């Protein structure tokens, strides 16, 4: 019901007042992904700063670690990454993005992933030359992210003869 009605303030209140992040990871993912798709990273990360429990869900844990890095809490983020690795965590794409953001790698990581909105955001954040052309199969979340981050082609610059590009923008 909460997701269907998309009342983000009510969802946030419900999750944080009851501290049920681990009992309802789907609702938490919906909330932070929606904020990120609107380019409201600060709001998404504020959710994690208010969570008192250890985050069990892998995706939410990755998001939390990224927020720590974004808030310059590198040591805390590194500790959580090390703990996750000891428990068998392995995600080469995610790790390479974080290594760049933490300054361990100096060469920008240019791979782009549309697997999740977090992966897509990390793709954008770690690539100074980021270019992405959405297609009909691009998720609505990514379209929203592209729009709110001003990453869509300027409509005036689109060739009027490029029917595919025009229809995908529509």
Task: Give the positions of each predicted feature.
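Boundary/linker segments of alpha-helical solenoid repeat arrays
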Residues: 22-27, 54-63, 87-111, 125, ...
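Residue-level signature for tetratricopeptide repeat
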Residues: 1, 30-35, 67-68
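Hydrophobic transmembrane helix bundles of membrane-integrated enzymes that assemble
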Residues: 48, 60-68
């Amino acid at each position: 019901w909460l997701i269907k009605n998309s009342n983000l303030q009510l969802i946030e209140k419900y999750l944080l007042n009851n501290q049920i992040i681990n009992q309802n990871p789907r609702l938490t993912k919906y909330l932070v992904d929606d904020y990120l798709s609107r380019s409201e990273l600060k709001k998404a990360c504020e959710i994690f700063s208010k969570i008192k429990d250890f985050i069990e869900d892998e995706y939410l844990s990755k998001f939390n670690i990224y927020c720590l890095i974004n808030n310059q809490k590198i040591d805390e983020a590194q500790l959580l990454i090390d703990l996750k690795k000891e428990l068998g965590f392995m995600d080469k794409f995610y790790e390479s993005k974080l290594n760049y953001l933490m300054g361990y790698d100096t060469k920008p990581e240019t791979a782009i992933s549309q697997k999740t909105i977090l992966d897509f955001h990390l793709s954008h954040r770690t690539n100074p030359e980021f270019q992405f052309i959405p297609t009909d199969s691009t998720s609505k979340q990514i379209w929203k992210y592209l729009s709110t981050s001003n990453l869509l082609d300027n409509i005036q610059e689109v060739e009027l003869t490029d029917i595919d590009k025009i229809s995908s923008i529509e």
